[in-house]
Structures are given as structure tokens and as C-alpha cells.
């Protein structure tokens, strides 16, 4: 398991310090910087992952491909690439911003709060997956249209950040562009 921190933010999104990642996520989680990424394969299918049961927040929940926290001195794009390698063992194309101003707060059934400024990215995989079981307990390659129908019909079956991202009209449009074969 990687030791990481989160970059704390004030209400205007300005960095104010750091805190160890595990300690940062509590019932009173402070606002911090994160990222979320949606990955597509060469067939235009979306990678949906199920969070490992050892995760502190939303264990066992289906979500978009990979999420994480940039480290000090690291761009969001560099953080996406790092976490894709760590969680999924996969190489990707340069991440593209699809929802740059996404911000949310949500509480999981155990009372753990996510409180994040969380730019959203999409990319294509360029290598085979090598799943890290400490991070991901299951995964599926799915047609984006099927996933979006599932989110619309049963939002409770997915992470709240995935649902909020997928219900944003502009983000949906940008995600749909990744289903086109290149």
C-alpha cells in the first residue's frame, strides 16, 4: 500500500496544507484535492471497478475506473497516470479533462465523508490490466450506454461521485466521445 497525503483546501480551493490520506477521511473530512478518471479500451468500452473491501470509504462499491489524490508537486494528470499504474497496472493515453470543476461532499453508510474538489478525466488504456487486489476486487468492461442506463435506473448501486459525474450533461457528452473507436 502506498503512503499518501491529501492536499487540504480552503473554501476557495486554495491549498492550505497536507494530511495523511487515511487520517484525512473521517466523519469530519476536510475539503481536499482529488481526481476521478474514466478509462476506455480500444473497443470503446468503459472500465468499471469495484472497490476493495479494505477501502475506508465505500468498500465494495462499483465506481468509475480509478480515483485518487494528487501529491505535492504533482499535476492532476501525473496523479491519474500514477494511480492507473498502481491500482490497475495499466498504461494510458494522456488524460483529458472532461469535468474540471467537479466538487462534491458525500457520506458513506459507515459515516466516512468524502469532501473533494475532484477534477474528472478520461483516457484510453494502452496495455493489459494487472489489477492490484488491495485496491480493486472486481472489474468489468462495459458499454458506456449500458452503464449510464444503470446509473439512471439504480444510482444506489454506484459510488455517489460516479453518479454525480455521469449525470452532468457536458461530462456525459465528453465521455461519449471516448466510445468512438480510434
From Swiss-Prot:
Its cofactor is Mg(2+); Mn(2+). InterPro entries: Idi_bact, IsopentenylPP_isomerase_typ1, NUDIX_hydrolase-like_dom_sf, NUDIX_hydrolase_dom. PROSITE patterns: NUDIX. It catalyses: isopentenyl diphosphate = dimethylallyl diphosphate. Its main location: cytoplasm. It comes from the Bacteria. The active site is at residues 67, 116. Binds 1 Mg(2+) ion per subunit. The magnesium ion binds only when substrate is bound. Its EC number is 5.3.3.2. Mg(2+) binds at residues 67, 87. SUPFAM superfamilies: Nudix. Keywords: Cytoplasm, Isomerase, Isoprene biosynthesis, Magnesium, Manganese, Metal-binding. It is found in: Cytoplasm. Coiled coil: none annotated. Mn(2+) binds at residues 25, 32, 69, 114, 116. GO terms for cellular component: cytoplasm. Residues 30-164 form the Nudix hydrolase domain. Pathway: Isoprenoid biosynthesis; dimethylallyl diphosphate biosynthesis; dimethylallyl diphosphate from isopentenyl diphosphate: step 1/1. GO terms for biological process: dimethylallyl diphosphate biosynthetic process; isoprenoid biosynthetic process. It holds the Pfam family NUDIX. Catalyzes the 1,3-allylic rearrangement of the homoallylic substrate isopentenyl (IPP) to its highly electrophilic allylic isomer, dimethylallyl diphosphate (DMAPP). Homodimer. Belongs to the IPP isomerase type 1 family. This is Isopentenyl-diphosphate Delta-isomerase. It comes from Escherichia coli O6:H1 (strain CFT073 / ATCC 700928 / UPEC).
Amino acid at each position: 500500500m502506498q503512503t499518501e497525503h491529501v492536499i487540504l483546501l480552503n473554501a476557495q480551493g486554495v491549498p492550505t496544507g497536507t494530511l495523511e490520506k487515511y487520517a484525512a477521511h473521517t466523519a469530519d473530512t476536510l475539503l481536499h484535492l482529488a481526481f476521478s478518471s474514466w478509462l476506455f479500451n480500444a473497443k470503446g468500452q468503459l472500465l468499471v471497478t469495484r472497490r476493495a473491501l479494505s477501502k475506508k470509504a465505500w468498500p465494495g462499491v462499483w465506481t468509475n475506473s480509478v480515483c485518487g489524490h494528487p501529491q505535492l508537486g504533482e499535476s492532476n494528470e501525473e496523479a491519474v497516470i500514477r494511480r492507473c499504474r498502481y491500482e490497475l497496472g495499466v498504461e494510458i493515453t494522456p488524460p483529458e479533462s472532461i469535468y474540471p470543476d467537479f466538487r462534491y461532499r458525500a457520506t458513506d453508510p459507515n459515516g466516512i465523508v468524502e469532501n473533494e474538489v475532484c477534477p474528472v478525466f478520461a483516457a484510453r488504456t494502452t496495455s493489459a490490466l494487472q489489477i492490484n487486489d488491495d485496491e480493486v476486487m472486481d472489474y468489468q468492461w462495459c458499454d458506456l450506454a449500458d452503464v449510464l442506463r444503470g446509473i439512471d435506473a439504480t444510482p444506489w448501486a454506484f459510488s455517489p461521485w460516479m453518479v454525480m459525474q455521469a449525470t452532468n450533461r457536458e461530462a456525459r457528452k465528453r465521455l461519449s466521445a471516448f466510445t468512438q473507436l480510434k
